[in-house]
Amino acid sequence: MARIAGVNIPNHQHAEIALTAIYGIGRARAREICEAAGINVSTKMKDVTDAEMDKLRDNVAKFVVEGDLRREVSMNIKRLMDLGCYRGLRHRRGLPVRGQRTRTNARTRKGPRKAVRASSAKAGR
């Protein structure tokens, strides 16, 4: 297995698919990187030579990927939360940020249901 940007790249996959194992690289960017390195996208990673692998590493290094990208995304979210804007408040409360309904659905973001207690229901009457 080759390592690019600190990630083990699977040998049995085509170059285009294998590069998507790196956080921040999707199919389109993987295809772009392969073309820049002069590698056919359907070439299996085990068939890529060392010189071609170096070209791949150089091309991947031009983009913000893995730890740097994760840090950048988390800092953007933290900035929104510090500003106190609507999106930041939604992040802080653990609710959907992009306008989805919350009366029903949104279970992934809200977490498991909280059971209604019988004693608190009687106290509310």
Curated annotation (Swiss-Prot):
Coiled coil: none annotated. GO terms for biological process: translation. Disulfide bonds: none annotated. NCBIfam families: uS13_bact. It comes from Nitrosospira multiformis (strain ATCC 25196 / NCIMB 11849 / C 71). InterPro entries: Rbsml_uS13_C (IPR027437), Ribosomal_uS13 (IPR001892), Ribosomal_uS13-like_H2TH (IPR010979), Ribosomal_uS13_bac-type (IPR019980), Ribosomal_uS13_CS (IPR018269). Keywords: Ribonucleoprotein, Ribosomal protein, RNA-binding, rRNA-binding, tRNA-binding. One of its GO terms (cellular component) is small ribosomal subunit. The gene is rpsM. Belongs to the universal ribosomal protein uS13 family. PROSITE patterns: RIBOSOMAL_S13_1, RIBOSOMAL_S13_2. Residues 94-116 have a biased composition (Basic residues). It comes from the Bacteria. This is Small ribosomal subunit protein uS13. Located at the top of the head of the 30S subunit, it contacts several helices of the 16S rRNA. In the 70S ribosome it contacts the 23S rRNA (bridge B1a) and protein L5 of the 50S subunit (bridge B1b), connecting the 2 subunits; these bridges are implicated in subunit movement. Contacts the tRNAs in the A and P-sites. Residues 94-125 are annotated as: Disordered. GO terms for molecular function: rRNA binding; structural constituent of ribosome; tRNA binding. Pfam families: Ribosomal_S13. The keyword Ribosomal protein applies. Part of the 30S ribosomal subunit. Forms a loose heterodimer with protein S19. Forms two bridges to the 50S subunit in the 70S ribosome.
